[in-house]
Design a protein with these regions (language model features):
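A short helix-loop-beta-strand connector motif used in the catalytic cores of GNAT acetyltransferases and
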Residues: 52-64
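Conserved GNAT-fold acetyl-CoA-binding loop/helix
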Residues: 31-52
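Acyl-donor (CoA/ACP) binding surface of acyl/acetyltransferases
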Residues: 1-34, 62, 66-170
Length: 170
């Protein structure tokens, strides 16, 4: 079981099935989903099924981002080990009304710190669509730097994005 983590403004905790309605607020929002690799969730029950799959592997770490002041769940994210390429990558998504306030950087920074200490991680990677300026800013604030141009497609193949890979060495 993942430990609960805290930052100045957030409580980071494992997501549960009971979070499905809150998670649907961003998983079902086309503005949030625009650059995500998964297809837009059409209903909350599908989000509940997704939540059942989280944190079943100790090297696939997902947290919910909860505002301390209100107890509101505003996003999720984590760090993930990819055995086939022997790398760790970060990922995140945040409710639209929480954008631009530094929450993602705050949360992912704490999650990286936890995973780095737990698994002795030496470097992390992140990929973002070139048009996703907010995600670029998050990675830069985390101290990540440009590695290479790339591209990625949604799981259903409906769209392919020009992208950039960023990296941070510890």
């Amino acid at each position: 079981m993942l430990p609960i983590l805290e930052t100045e403004r957030l409580i980071l905790r494992p997501l549960t099935e009971d979070d499905y309605l809150d998670c649907f607020k961003w998983c079902g929002d086309p503005r949030v989903n625009e650059y995500m690799i998964y297809t837009l969730y059409k209903n909350a029950e599908d989000v509940k099924e997704w939540l059942k799959t989280l944190n079943t592997d100790e090297k696939h770490i997902d947290y919910g981002f909860v505002l301390k002041e209100s107890g509101k769940l505003i996003g999720s994210g984590g760090i993930y080990y990819h055995e086939e390429s022997d790398i760790w990558s970060i990922g995140y998504n945040l409710a639209f009304d929480a954008w631009g306030k530094g929450y993602t950087t705050e949360a992912i920074s704490k999650i990286i710190e936890y995973a780095k200490n737990r698994f002795n991680i030496k470097e992390i990677y992140g990929t973002f669509a070139v048009d996703n300026i907010g995600s670029r800013r998050v990675m830069e604030k985390l101290g990540m730097t440009y590695l290479e141009d790339t591209e990625y497609s949604k799981f259903d193949g409906s769209r392919t994005y020009k992208a950039k890979n960023y990296k941070k060495v510890f």
